[in-house]
UniProtKB/Swiss-Prot annotation:
GO terms for cellular component: plasma membrane. The keyword Cell inner membrane applies. The keyword Ion transport applies. The system is composed of three essential subunits: KdpA, KdpB and KdpC. Keywords: ATP-binding, Cell inner membrane, Cell membrane, Ion transport, Membrane, Nucleotide-binding, Potassium, Potassium transport, Transmembrane, Transmembrane helix, Transport. It comes from Pseudomonas putida (strain GB-1). Belongs to the KdpC family. One of its GO terms (molecular function) is P-type potassium transmembrane transporter activity. Its main location: membrane. This is Potassium-transporting ATPase KdpC subunit. It is a single-pass membrane protein.
Amino acid sequence: MNAYVRPALSLALLMTLLTGVLYPLAVTGVAQVAFPNQANGSLVRDEHGQVRGSALIAQDFQGDGWFHSRPSAGAYATVASSASNLSPSNPALAERVKGDAATLFQAQQGPVPQALLTTSGSGLDPHLPPEAVAYQIPRVAAARQLPVERLQALQEEATLHPLIGPPVVNVLALNQKIEQLSH
């Protein structure tokens, strides 16, 4: 029996050391050297070096002077990140969407873009399609007393064109540009 136990325990200890300690340390070291910003959470800092958020996680911006992110089923909390898991036939989902659409439609004119009414799969998607950002420009321009053309130019600057997929705008980056205009 001892002939079987000792090799099994040795192999278990070796594999635990390799896969539980050495491999994670090696991957972390390579990531810190090759991709330091991404390895540390893609943190976004303001002009004073203060962390304002992550480029990968949406935030709840309140008030008419800010561009708003998609709705979040988990209140923008990373611990509770998930979709609402409500089916399209669920009355609670229909009521939330109707309420959001009515609020957005009162503030603006025209049909509300779908991205401003639906949550993302994670509930934390920081990006919006350019059309959803453009829909909010008149509200933000009026609240901040800025020319619409200036906000359109900022939107163009903040629009990302990924290799695969449609263009998107990072709402945190766009709101940071607006905040810099105020200073």
